[in-house]
Regions:
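C-terminal extensions
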Residues: 139, 150-151
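Conserved small/polar residues in nucleotide/adenosyl-binding loops
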Residues: 153-159
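Secondary-structure boundary/capping motif
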Residues: 17, 151-152
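A short, flexible beta-alpha/helix-coil linker loop
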Residues: 67-69, 147-150
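Short, acidic/small-residue loops that bind anionic groups at enzyme active sites
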Residues: 113-145
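Contiguous, glycine/small-aliphatic-enriched amphipathic segments in soluble metabolic enzymes
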Residues: 1-104, 109-115
């Protein structure tokens, strides 16, 4: 039997969090059976689990009292909000307490935190975003490798 994947989820990041995040994690736990750790404000998450009627053993809670908002500057937030749901989830991943980390929160903070805390694989210089996108026939992987502009030579402005 295959080993279960341990998924750390930033329960406080994203639109309509944590309620919609908790609902989605309940669906995932029921459908896929993975071990999910919701990272965020324990009392609020517990309330949403209870409200949804969840009483299974596949969802755990890791308390984190701070939240990184979409308005926070990524590097500052990762460095200063050490008890944020995003930072604690990345720390769990780095320490081997999870196999996967998912967040719908501040993308810049997620990429910055992953780079500073979890680190890149040797030989990888730049990260890429790779979300699964729904399609009529299932889903597809969309890779955003970013764009780099290289100025090869300079010339006088055409003005």
């Amino acid at each position: 039997m295959a080993e279960l994947v341990r998924v750390a989820v930033d329960a406080m990041g994203g639109d309509n969090a944590p309620e919609e995040i908790v609902k989605g994690c309940i669906m995932a736990a029921n459908d896929f059976g993975e071990i999910i750790t919701l990272v965020g404000k324990k009392d609020i998450i517990s309330e949403h689990l209870k409200k949804a009627g969840y009483n299974g053993d596949r969802i755990k809670i890791q308390n984190a009292e701070e939240v990184i908002s979409g308005d926070d500057e990524p590097t500052t937030a990762i460095r200063q909000k050490k008890d944020s749901s995003l930072r604690v989830g990345l720390d769990m991943l780095h320490k081997g307490q999870g196999d996967v980390m998912v967040s719908a929160g501040n993308t810049g903070a997620l990429i910055t935190g992953a780079t500073l805390i979890v680190k890149r694989i040797k030989g990888v210089r730049r990260v890429a975003l790779a979300p699964l996108m729904p399609a009529e026939t299932g889903c597809f992987l969309l890779v955003d490798g970013g764009a780099n502009v290289c100025l090869l030579y300079t010339s006088p402005s055409p003005r």
